[in-house]
C-alpha cells in the first residue's frame, strides 16, 4: 500500500494536506521543501516510522532535528556547495538492515561507507572542498551557540524586505 500525497498543480493551490500520521505506512519518504511550487513542510514526528527525507532545498538554511529522521540527504548544489556531492546522514539503527539485501549496490550500502570511514571511493575533491568552505563561512557568520537559528532569522528578514519591496513597487515578479 502506498500513500501518495501530492497537490494538484492544475488547481493552483500550493497547500498540501497530509493524512493523519497513524494512517501512513511504516516507511515515509518525502521532500521537505519543494521549490517549484513553493511548498515547504514543517518537521513532522512520524512516530515509529522509517523516515527518509530529501532536505536538499533547505539544508544548512535552518536547524533540523536529526532525531525525527532515519535518513536525511541533501544534494550539495542547492545550499552547501557545488554539484557532485550528496550529503547523507543515516541513523545507525538502519545500518544492519541495509546490508541484508544482496541486491544493494556497494555505493548505496551505508554500512560499507561507515566501515570505510565515509571514503569508500575517491570523493569529488573540489566539490567536497566547496562544501568545507561553505560550512566554514556559516561558522564564521554566526556564534557557536545557535549557528543555523541565526542564519534562518537573517534569511527571513531578507525575505520580508524583498516581499515588501515587491508589494510596494510592483517591480519584481
Spans of features found by a protein language model:
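Active-site cofactor/substrate anionic-group-binding motifs, chiefly glycine-
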Residues: 1
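Conserved active-site segment immediately N-terminal to the catalytic lysine
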Residues: 52, 66-77
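Conserved hydrophobic/aromatic beta-strand scaffold that supports enzyme active sites
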Residues: 27, 71, 85-89
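A short secondary-structure junction signal
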Residues: 14-16, 38-43, 61-67, 83-86, ...
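Conserved PLP-binding catalytic core of the aspartate aminotransferase-like
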Residues: 172-173
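Active-site phosphate-binding strand-loop segment of PLP-dependent enzymes
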Residues: 4-59
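Active-site C-terminal subdomain of aminotransferase-like
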Residues: 76-163
Amino acid at each position: 500500500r502506498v500513500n501518495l500525497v501530492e497537490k494538484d498543480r492544475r488547481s493552483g493551490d500550493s497547500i498540501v494536506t497530509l493524512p493523519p500520521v497513524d494512517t501512513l505506512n511504516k516507511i515515509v519518504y518525502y521532500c521537505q521543501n519543494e521549490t517549484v511550487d513553493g511548498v515547504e513542510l514543517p518537521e513532522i514526528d512520524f512516530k515509529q516510522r522509517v523516515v527518509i527525507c530529501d532536505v536538499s532545498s533547505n539544508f544548512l538554511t535552518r536547524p533540523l532535528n536529526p532525531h525525527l529522521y532515519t535518513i536525511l540527504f541533501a544534494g550539495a548544489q542547492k545550499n552547501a556547495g557545488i554539484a557532485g556531492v550528496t550529503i547523507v546522514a543515516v541513523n545507525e539503527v538502519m545500518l544492519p538492515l541495509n546490508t541484508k539485501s544482496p541486491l544493494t549496490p556497494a555505493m548505496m550500502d551505508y554500512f560499507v561507507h561507515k566501515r570505510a570511514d565515509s571514503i569508500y571511493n575517491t570523493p569529488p575533491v573540489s566539490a567536497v572542498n566547496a562544501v568545507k568552505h561553505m560550512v566554514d563561512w556559516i561558522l564564521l557568520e554566526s556564534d557557536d551557540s545557535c549557528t543555523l537559528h541565526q542564519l534562518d532569522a537573517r534569511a527571513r528578514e531578507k525575505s520580508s524586505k524583498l516581499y515588501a519591496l515587491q508589494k510596494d513597487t510592483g517591480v519584481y515578479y
